[in-house]
Curated annotation (Swiss-Prot):
Changing E305A: Decreased DNA transposase activity. Residues 30-117 are annotated as: Disordered. The modification Phosphoserine is found at S521. This is PiggyBac transposable element-derived protein 5. Changing E442A: No effect on DNA transposase activity, nor on cell transforming activity. It comes from Homo sapiens (Human).
Length: 524
C-alpha cells in the first residue's frame, strides 16, 4: 500500500471518521480538561508531543516509534513466514491457521451511578470520594496524635484541637498547590509571587503549620498491623469503595503507572543541593483506568520495603512483580468481560490465560526483553534478517490467544484474546497516510493514545506539596486522583452545562469552597 501518496492522504479523513465511529466511546477525548493542547486538532488518537508517554507505550525491540492513530483499511498483505520449527510450535498449540471469533460481550452502561443536580458545586463532586465522615475521622486522628505527641515530648502551648472547618481549609490550602505550582505551600503567606492574600486571610500561617505538624489519618499502629502504609491504608480503602460506588467503567481499561514524577516547575527552581537532599520515592503507584473517560477505577500502591535484593528497585522490570500488581488491580473485575490493555512488563501468556478463565480479556504490547515470554513461539519473537514492508504482519493462534508481529519501522508484538485475528484495522500517520494492521493493534493505539493524552494533562494537576514521609506522599497523590475523578464526573453531569469550568477553574473553585470563600450547594 502506498505510503505518503496523494491518494492515501485523500483517503485518510474518511478512514479516520470510520475509526472514530469504532471508538466513539472516547467521548471526553481531547477536551477532557476543558482545554486543548498544542497538538490536539480534535483527534484523540495523536500524542500531544514527541515526549508523550505514548512513545513508550508502544516501543518496539528495534526502534521506538509508537503506533499512530487508528482507522480502517482493506486487508493488507502479510509478511512471508520465516523458516521455523513448525512441529515444536504445533505441539505447543500454536498455529498459523486463523479463525474468527466474536468480541467479548458487554452490555453494561458505563458512567456515573448518581445523577447530580445542575446546582452541584465542585466540593459536592469532591465529597463523593472524600465525604465529611472521612474528614471527621482525620480531625479525630490528628487530635489524638497531637495529644500523644505532647504527652511524650512535652506540652505545646500554641496547639488547639483542630475542627472540621479547619480540616477542610487545611485540605484547601494543600489542593491549591495543584493549581498554582510552587516550591512550598507556605508561599501563600509569603507576600511573594505565589502569595494569595484572599486565601491567606482564612487561616494564619502559624495555625496551618501546627495542623501540618500533627496531621494524621491513622494516629497509631495496632498490634496486628505490619503493613508499611498502615497510616494511610484506611483512607485508600475508603477511596476505593467510593470509586466503585460512584462510577461504572466502560469495557476497555488500561493498567499502567500514571505520571507522578517531580513537578518540573519545582525542579527548575531548585538548587543542585536541594535536589540531592530530596529522597527517592519509596513506592510505586499503579492504576486501572477507564480508557473511555480517564476515570481511575482502582489504585494499587506497591511499597518498597527495603533496599535489599527483594526491594522494588530489584523487581522493577521483573514480570513477577507486575503480574502481582495486575492481579491486585483486577481483583474486582472478574466475570465482567472487561478488555484490559497492558504494557510489556505485564503482558504474558500465563497471566492472560489466567484472566480469561475469570472473564477478563486482554490486549498487551510484548517485548522480549521486558515481558514474560514463557509459552510463546520463538519464531514470532525473532526478527527476520530482512525487514518486511511497512504494515506487514504475522499472526499465530492458540485457542483464543493471538500473537501478532507487526512491522512499522520496527517490529511490534502484541498478545491478545480480546480481538479477532482476521479483523483488519489501520494506523493513520500524518505524513505516511494509512498503515495496515490487525484490529488489535488499532485498538491498542487508540486507547493507549487517549490515556497518554489524559496523563499528560491530569499530571499537571497533582498536588505539588512534597512531604518526606511516604504515607503522606501516597495520601496527597490519592487526593489528587480523587479530584481528577471528581472533575470527570462533573463533566459528565448536568452541572457542567450550567458552568463549563476547565480543570484549572474547577480546582480553583474547589479550593475556595473548602476554605469557605464560596458557598457550596447543599446537596449532601
Amino acid at each position: 500500500m502506498a505510503e505518503g501518496g496523494g491518494g492515501a492522504r485523500r483517503r485518510a479523513p474518511a478512514l479516520l471518521e470510520a475509526a472514530r465511529a469504532r471508538y466513539e466511546s472516547l467521548h471526553i477525548s481531547d477536551d477532557v480538561f476543558g482545554e486543548s493542547g498544542p497538538d490536539s486538532g480534535g483527534n484523540p488518537f495523536y500524542s500531544t508531543s514527541a515526549a508523550s508517554r505514548s512513545s513508550s507505550a508502544a516501543s518496539s525491540d528495534d526502534e521506538r516509534e509508537p503506533p499512530g492513530p487508528p482507522g480502517a483499511a482493506p486487508p493488507p498483505p502479510r509478511a512471508p513466514d520465516a523458516q521455523e520449527p513448525e512441529e515444536d510450535e504445533a505441539g505447543a498449540g500454536w498455529s498459523a491457521a486463523l479463525r474468527d471469533r466474536p468480541p467479548p460481550r458487554f452490555e453494561d452502561t458505563g458512567g456515573p451511578t448518581r445523577k447530580m443536580p445542575p446546582s452541584a458545586s465542585a466540593v459536592d463532586f469532591f465529597q463523593l470520594f472524600v465525604p465529611d465522615n472521612v474528614l471527621k475521622n482525620m480531625v479525630v486522628q490528628t487530635n489524638m496524635y497531637a495529644k500523644k505527641f505532647q504527652e511524650r515530648f512535652g506540652s505545646d502551648g500554641a496547639w488547639v484541637e483542630v475542627t472540621l472547618t479547619e480540616m477542610k481549609a487545611f485540605l484547601g490550602y494543600m489542593i491549591s498547590t495543584s493549581i498554582s505550582h510552587c516550591e512550598s505551600v507556605l508561599s501563600i503567606w509569603s507576600g511573594g509571587f505565589y502569595s494569595n492574600r484572599s486565601l491567606a486571610l482564612v487561616m494564619s500561617q502559624a495555625r496551618f503549620e501546627k495542623i501540618l505538624k500533627y496531621f494524621h489519618v491513622v494516629a497509631f499502629r495496632s498490634s496486628q498491623t505490619t503493613h508499611g502504609l498502615y497510616k494511610v491504608q484506611p483512607f485508600l480503602d475508603s477511596l476505593q469503595n467510593s470509586f466503585d460506588s460512584a462510577f461504572r467503567p466502560s469495557q476497555t481499561q488500561v493498567l499502567h503507572e500514571p505520571l507522578i514524577d517531580e513537578d518540573p516547575v519545582f525542579i527548575a527552581t531548585c538548587t543542585e543541593r536541594e535536589l540531592r537532599k530530596r529522597k527517592k520515592r519509596k513506592f510505586s503507584l499503579w492504576v486501572r483506568q477507564c480508557s473511555s473517560t480517564g476515570f481511575i477505577i482502582q489504585i494499587y500502591v506497591h511499597l518498597k520495603e527495603g533496599g535489599g535484593p527483594d526491594g522494588l528497585d530489584a523487581l522493577k522490570n521483573k514480570p513477577q512483580l507486575h503480574s502481582m500488581v495486575a492481579r491486585s488491580l483486577c481483583r474486582n473485575a472478574a466475570g465482567k468481560n472487561y478488555i484490559i490493555f497492558t504494557g510489556p512488563s505485564i503482558t504474558s501468556l500465563t497471566l492472560f490465560e489466567e484472566f480469561e478463565k475469570q472473564g477478563i480479556y486482554c490486549c498487551g504490547l510484548l517485548r522480549a526483553r521486558k515481558s514474560d515470554c514463557t509459552g510463546l513461539p520463538l519464531s514470532m519473537l525473532t526478527n527476520p534478517a530482512t525487514p518486511p514492508a511497512r504494515g506487514q504482519y504475522q499472526i499465530k493462534m492458540k485457542g483464543n490467544m493471538s500473537l501478532i508481529c507487526w512491522y512499522n519501522k520496527g517490529h511490534f508484538r502484541f498478545l491478545t484474546n480480546a480481538y479477532s485475528p482476521v479483523q483488519q484495522g489501520v494506523i493513520i500517520k500524518r505524513k505516511s497516510g494509512e498503515i495496515p494492521c490487525p484490529l488489535a493493534v488499532e485498538a491498542f493505539a487508540a486507547h493507549l493514545s487517549y490515556i497518554c493524552r489524559y496523563d499528560d494533562k491530569y499530571s499537571k494537576y497533582f498536588i505539588s506539596h512534597k512531604p518526606n514521609k511516604t504515607w503522606q506522599q501516597v495520601f496527597w497523590f490519592a487526593i489528587s486522583i480523587a479530584i481528577n475523578n471528581a472533575y470527570i464526573l462533573y463533566k459528565m453531569s448536568d452541572a457542567y452545562h450550567v458552568k463549563r469550568y476547565s480543570r484549572a477553574q474547577f480546582g480553583e473553585r474547589l479550593v475556595r469552597e473548602l476554605l469557605g470563600l464560596e458557598d457550596a450547594s447543599p446537596t449532601h
